[in-house]
């Protein structure tokens, strides 16, 4: 028979007492009062923070947006079909954040930074808050480096700098997304990280953009954040902030980033839906009163950082759709007032075959020539002036039949300059190619050609300079100045190519 040893028992009891961990776990909980339309009303959750994540019994996550005296209004990040009245909810003590890392490059993710491209999990050791404050005044420096889009009309006349916010605005089907994707393609080899945020788009449109980027090798330096039109309003509202958090991760690591929001007016509609369901008072066009703040806090995160912070940058290109050219609607005017300029795309120009359909007259960049290299400044000034004079003359010439020779020549020159601004989609030009194209047009070398021949001649001239006069591109890229030597090389090339072209024709 086993003997009971009192000292052993007392030792065991003593050990257990010493190991006893008096950890008290306080959980902030509540009860679901009602649920529906992506909104839940919760009783309890007394100490919840505004914007805090809450977790429902069946696993759905929500964000506490309305903190009222009797209940808490929560927006759901999912369909919430399994949430029942009376089920419990607990506060997590966390604000919405996402994992961030280099591994996101080349991937398609949703607003919660979960991959949706079927290529497995993305591993990351760091995270960032989805909503983080924009850099302050001391943390910034003025924009001075160009961000080349590869489109002559933009780089010459409406230049965009690294750290700028430039709005792309126009009616549907005028090529807004094409301008943005061409800009992404043109960043190849420029060490710029691109983030494309698709908000409330058709899934087929997003797939088209992703395929176009993959075919041309641009996905290597691009992240696509997509929330399609059938996504919950909460996720459409969060998607742009997720994209901004990813771009900021690279910006604070001394990298240059480009972020495209396509389009913030869909985000505003999702936010309006959430606000109305939460019974917040509606304002103009039924948008809530803080819809301006919705976009300003997003776009202010784009910046050119000071040298103390490493001079990283985040350039934002929001895309806003207008209804039959009306830029005085609520969301367009809001975004115009926040951004540093706008590129206006016109349906009339698009239908007239001028593509990209940029209306140079009413488009503007508030950074201006600070975002251009010296070589571009040398040739672009004349182009702007001549096109402005041509637009004026063309309007006047409609009412007059007999024009003097000088006016006819000016009109002919203007038509050829307009022709040289046309570009095919997904064929961005280098700075050197743009400079030689503009120089050829503004110095009258195209005047002897028929309008239909202009684009063909310019294509052949660019190929000729690339193969026969490679020194031209070397001079422009190394000195950033359109030197006399470069000018002499270009004049020779134009003359030689002109002779070859006339023989072929």
Curated annotation (Swiss-Prot):
UniProt site (Required for activity): 363
One example GO MF annotation: ATP binding
GO cellular component: chloroplast thylakoid membrane; proton-transporting ATP synthase complex
Catalytic activity: ATP + H2O + 4 H(+)(in) = ADP + phosphate + 5 H(+)(out)
InterPro entries noted in UniProt: ATP_synth_asu-like_sf (IPR023366), ATP_synth_asu_C (IPR000793), ATP_synth_asu_C_sf (IPR038376), ATP_synth_F1_a_nt-bd_dom (IPR033732), ATP_synth_F1_asu (IPR005294), ATPase_a/bsu_AS (IPR020003), ATPase_F1/V1/A1_a/bsu_N (IPR004100), ATPase_F1/V1/A1_a/bsu_N_sf (IPR036121)
Compartment(s) where it occurs, according to its Swiss-Prot or TrEMBL record: Plastid, Chloroplast thylakoid membrane
Residues annotated to bind ATP: 170-177
Keyword Transcription regulation part of the UniProt annotation: no
Subunit structure as annotated in this protein's UniProt entry: F-type ATPases have 2 components, CF(1) - the catalytic core - and CF(0) - the membrane proton channel. CF(1) has five subunits: alpha(3), beta(3), gamma(1), delta(1), epsilon(1). CF(0) has four main subunits: a, b, b' and c.
Family the entry assigns: Belongs to the ATPase alpha/beta chains family.
Protein name: ATP synthase subunit alpha, chloroplastic
Organism: Oenothera biennis
């Amino acid at each position: 028979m086993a003997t009971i040893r009192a000292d052993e028992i007392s030792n065991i009891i003593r050990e257990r007492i010493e190991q006893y961990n008096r950890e008290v776990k306080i959980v902030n909980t509540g009860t679901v009062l009602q649920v529906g339309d992506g909104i839940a009303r919760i009783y309890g959750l007394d100490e919840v923070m505004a914007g805090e994540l809450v977790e429902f019994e069946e696993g759905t996550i929500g964000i506490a947006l309305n903190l009222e005296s009797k209940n808490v209004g929560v927006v759901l990040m999912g369909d919430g079909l399994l949430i029942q009245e009376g089920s419990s909810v607990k506060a997590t003590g966390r604000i919405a954040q996402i994992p961030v890392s280099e591994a996101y490059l080349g991937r398609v993710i949703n607003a919660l930074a979960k991959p949706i491209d079927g290529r497995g999990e993305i591993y990351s050791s760091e995270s960032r808050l989805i909503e983080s404050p924009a850099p302050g005044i001391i943390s910034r420096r003025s924009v001075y480096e160009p961000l080349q889009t590869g489109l002559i009309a933009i780089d010459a006349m409406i230049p965009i700098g690294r750290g700028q916010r430039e709005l792309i605005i126009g009616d549907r089907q005028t090529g807004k997304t094409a301008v943005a994707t061409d800009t992404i393609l043109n960043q190849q080899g420029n060490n710029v990280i691109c983030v494309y945020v698709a908000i409330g788009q058709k899934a087929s449109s997003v797939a088209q953009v992703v395929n176009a980027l993959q075919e041309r090798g641009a996905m290597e330096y691009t992240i696509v954040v997509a929330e399609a039109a059938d996504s919950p309003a909460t996720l459409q509202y969060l998607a742009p902030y997720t994209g901004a958090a990813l771009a900021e991760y690279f910006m604070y690591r001394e990298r240059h980033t480009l972020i495209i929001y396509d389009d913030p007016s869909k985000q505003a509609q999702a936010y309006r839906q959430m606000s109305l369901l939460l019974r917040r008072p509606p304002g103009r066009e039924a948008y809530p009163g803080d819809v301006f703040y919705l976009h300003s806090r997003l776009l202010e995160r784009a910046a050119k950082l000071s040298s103390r912070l490493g001079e990283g940058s985040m350039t934002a290109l929001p895309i806003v759709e207008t209804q039959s050219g009306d830029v005085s609607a609520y969301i367009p005017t809001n975004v115009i007032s926040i951004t540093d300029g706008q590129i206006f795309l016109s349906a009339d120009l698009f239908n007239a075959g001028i593509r990209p359909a940029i209306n140079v007259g009413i488009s503007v960049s508030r950074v201006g020539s600070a975002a251009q290299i010296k070589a571009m400044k040398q040739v672009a000034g004349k182009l702007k002036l001549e096109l402005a004079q041509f637009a004026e003359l063309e309007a006047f010439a409609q009412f007059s039949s007999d024009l003097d020779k000088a006016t006819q020549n000016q009109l002919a020159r203007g038509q050829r300059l307009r022709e040289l601004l046309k570009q095919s989609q997904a064929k961005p030009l280098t700075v050197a190619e743009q400079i030689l194209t503009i120089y050829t047009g503004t110095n009258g070398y195209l005047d002897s050609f028929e309008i239909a021949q202009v684009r063909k001649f310019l294509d052949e001239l660019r190929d000729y300079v690339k193969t026969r006069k490679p020194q031209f591109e070397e001079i422009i890229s190394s000195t950033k100045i359109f030197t006399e030597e470069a000018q002499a090389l270009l004049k020779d090339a134009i003359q030689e190519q002109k002779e070859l072209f006339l023989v072929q024709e």
